[in-house]
């Protein structure tokens, strides 16, 4: 909720990097350690161990980032411990894809989720307050939009994708009714 007008918040995203916690944060000040973050990007997603290993092989540095916090930002930018690394998709056309595939197959059994899971736990811890605020705002909006309708007249358009899955979950939780058609 916008503190000025009381309306819905805008979905403008500025993502910062917490050097202490080694994860992206959605608030300028990390709610866990209190350190001020530096601007990172406007969109970010975790790089899973499989993609991380492939990236390392392409860069000719297998397992170089295994214990690091690796993220993908908008524009196919990769960040390792908050620093952008040099990587260009267009350079892939000069690589031997068969050799990359072979090396990946040889190394994938040594790949691990241990450090990735630790980073995800830290990311969730550092961003849970914002997540909870967004969920509560969404549930409040759903309740306000449905207050004049009978539950039997409601349904959620459901394709099975991640967006409709999240929407169905939010509607079910907001209205405390798992029977809503979707």
Regions found by a protein language model. Name each.
Residues 1-39, 43, 54, 65-182:
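ATP-dependent adenylation/nucleotidyltransferase module used to activate substrates
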Residues 46-61:
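Intrinsically disordered, low-complexity segments
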